[in-house]
Structures are given as structure tokens and as C-alpha cells.
Amino acid sequence: MSEDRKAIKRALISVYDKTGLEDLAQALHRAGVEIVSTGSTAAKIADLGIPVTPVEELTGFPECLEGRVKTLHPKVHAGILADTRKDDHLRQLDELGVTPFQLVVVNLYPFAETVASGADFDDCVEQIDIGGPSMVRAAAKNHPSVAVVTSPGQYEDVVSVLNTGGFSRAERTKLAAEAFRHTATYDVTVATWISEQLSAADTELEFPGWIGSTSTLARSLRYGENPHQSAALYVSHGASGLAQATQLHGKEMSYNNYTDSDAAWRAAWDHERPCVAIIKHANPCGIAVSDESIAAAHRQAHACDSVSAFGGVIASNREVSVEMAEQVAEIFTEVIIAPSYEEGAVEVLSQKKNIRILQAEAPVREGFETREISGGLLVQERDLIHAEGDNPANWTLAAGEAVSAEVLKDLEFAWTAVRSVKSNAILLAKDGATVGVGMGQVNRVDSARLAVDRAGEERATGSVAASDAFFPFADGFEVLAQAGITAVVQPGGSIRDDEVIEAANKAGVTMYLTGARHFSH
């Protein structure tokens, strides 16, 4: 037996999730391990006909306060925390009549699941585990002497070492690290929830006074934004979205694949109608909606800028049909992401060996988003199409005549789509599709010129335009008017609004003001 291995002679088991408990208890019993257990765990083991010592028999103190106090006792924690490498600790154990544990198996009350179920405050508080984390942390601290297991997924490892002298020191250290991560995640979940409750109760406190989050390494990526940068994907606990997407086909996702897919996924789901968004370098090559079919939406989105769409990322907010898949298969595409795929669509797409096919749940649309800055974190409410000014019914007609219902529908589409464009952003649209996108320029005039240039004379004529922020001068608007747009929607709010509105009236272009802005940096 290696000197750093600790044979398992005595185990303490207290688990809420009983998955795998039967096999574990039977294996421990066959190996001659003494089992001490609590409450329903002890009852489950006893029902298997396996000898088990209830913890109250060990402590001489009954379980009380509706189960809130079971294991918080020196005879339990001394047996966990005793460093058996130290003669003084062994002497004290002998004096106290305490036998040490070599294995602690604990999983915790389902606090996060209780919160997610919509339970009331008191029920959530009742699911905050106290004794469990105390035992886990004690065993993890004392990993030179004790192995700690916090997940049914680790039970096979326990069984495999029972006849080989127990876990090695390195293995116990690894288990301890996993245990500390487990309790840290649990504590962050509790602390975040209770901070949110305080914020909700205090109308003057818009943001919680404390923010915590935990993420787990999902996989290393080939490299980051550039080949000289290392990178990895971490998944957030309790979250769902792109990071948890199922990859149905293709090469491993890259860092840039993820950033573009995230932008595309969000852009597609900004729209309630069937929508396809094609993204490259986090900016739209094309976005389109269609009540005819998702394939029609894809054709229109691709037509906006077919050159830039080469090697792009495609997102659909509806099931991808075989018809759409056949269209996509004709174009080099890095990633396609959708909530589902019609039978046969994946097979069609898979003819392209390298395309990455993802299936994901709809993105989280509420809540807050964060951005790291040097020395801190910026937090803001996620920008959604839900401001009062995003509803055309609340727009102000500032110039020209009211447009028809069809043109207003195009204006609403353009206004929704421009949120996905990096500022300064100008977007031209016609018939539910973008026809020209001007993005990321440091002045609005250049964004307008870029949008018009991308559209070309034929498509720009008769289109409508959206600007993510106000026109500071009339010059940006005049570029659009000269290109032949019929209507434009913009936030307004410039000190030169009168000048811009006057230019619209002179050009015979209808102008709506939203009072809302959608910068994106």
C-alpha cells in the first residue's frame, strides 16, 4: 500500500440526492466499511439491509429543529477534522472516544432548484443547507486524512479504490478542490439570491449591493480572438443559452465562432416574426423576416450582402427547414444555430464537412449584462426592444406625411434590426429585409454613406432607414435622402433636431422620432 493512500474504514454519508446511493452503500458494506448516516439517508441504507449507525446514536443528541441540527456536533466534526498524521490529534480522539472518518459523502439541499421553482421566500430559506456545507468544507480542509465526495458522479471512483488502499493524496486533493468549488458555487447562489431579494424590496436600490457568479471550464479552445491568444469556454452555473448549445455536427467551435454566434442568436431573437440573421465580426451582413417561410427569410438576409455573408454565422429563431438547409449548404458558412431542425435538415447541412450545426434554447432576454473594465465591472440592464419608444404607436411624426401600414412595418423592422449593429449605425430596409448596413463608423455621415454604398442605387431607392442614435447634423440624413429613401426613424434629441427635421421636410422624406436610443459598442 502506498504511504499516501488512506484505507477507507469509516464513512459518513448524508445526501439529499439519493442517486447511486444503493450501489455505493453496498460496495462500502462489502469492503467492510463502517457507515454512519443521517435522517432519510440512514433510513434508505437500512432498508437495503446494510448495517448503518444513525448520527444521533453517534452523538447522543437527537435531531432537532425540524432537521436543522443533525451533524453540527463535536463527535461528528472531530472525526472529520482530525489530522491523523499528528500524534496529538490521535491522542485527543482517543480521550474523546471519537473514531476518525476516512470518507465523507455529502450533497446539498437543492437551493437553486427551489428558487427556480418559484417557491416563496421562507421555502427558499429552508433549503439553505448548513450542516452539509460544514461537513464538506471540514473534510476538504482535512484532505490529507479524509476523502470528500459531493456528487453521485464520483461514486464509481470510490468503489474502484476500496480494494486498492483508498484514495491517494493527489486524488484527495483533487476531490477537496472540487468540494470547495461546490460549496463556493452554493454560497454564491445563496448570496446572489438574497441580495436580489433586498434589491427588490428597496425601491431606491436598482442594483444589488453584491454580485457573484461562478463558471466551470467546459473546454479549451484552439486559440482566442487571434492565434497568439489562448482561450477557453466556461459555462455559467444555472444558465442556459449558447454556451450550453448542443453541437450536432462540425469542427470544434472557435472563440470567434462563439462571439459571432452570440451576436447572431441575439439579433434573430430580437424579432417576433420568423427571422434569419447573418453575422460576421459581430455585425450583420443581413437580417430578414418573412411570414412566408424561414427559407425566404434566409434568402432575403443573404441577398443584403452576399459577399460579406461568405464565412459568416447564420441564426434562425425558427426551426430550420430542409429548404433553408439546402440554401445554406450552397454557401460557405462557419456556424448555423437554431432552436430545432426539420427532419432531414441536419443531414443536408452535414454534407458540408466543416459547418458547425448548433441547437440551442432561446437566449435570456431579461436581466443584466456585464463588461469587464480595468479594475472592475460595468453592469447594465440588457438592451432589449422593449422601451416605450420602440413601439411605433409611441413614435412622433416629425416631418412629412404618415406612412402606410406596410411602410410602417418596414420602419419597425429597421428600428429593431439596427439594435444589432455596432454604433454608429445606419440601416436601410425594404420588404422586411436589410438592404444596406453601415456600421462601426466614428461619425454618422460615414455610416450613412456605407449603408447607401452597400445597398446600391437600385435598392436604396424607395427603402426606409433607421439610425441607432440622433443625427447631430443634417449631413448624415442628407446622404440618405439623396439616395432616395422614403422614410427614416431615429431617436431625436439633438440640439439641431430642428435643422434635421427641416432637411427632411425639404426632401419630402417622412421622419419619425422614437425618443429611445440603441447604441451598441
From Swiss-Prot:
Residues 1-150 form the MGS-like domain. Belongs to the PurH family. InterPro entries: AICAR_Tfase_dup_dom_sf (IPR024051), Cytidine_deaminase-like (IPR016193), MGS-like_dom (IPR011607), MGS-like_dom_sf (IPR036914), PurH-like (IPR002695). Keywords: Hydrolase, Multifunctional enzyme, Purine biosynthesis, Transferase. SMART domains: AICARFT_IMPCHas, MGS. It comes from Corynebacterium efficiens (strain DSM 44549 / YS-314 / AJ 12310 / JCM 11189 / NBRC 100395). The IMP cyclohydrolase activity resides in the N-terminal region. Its EC number is 2.1.2.3, 3.5.4.10. This is Bifunctional purine biosynthesis protein PurH.
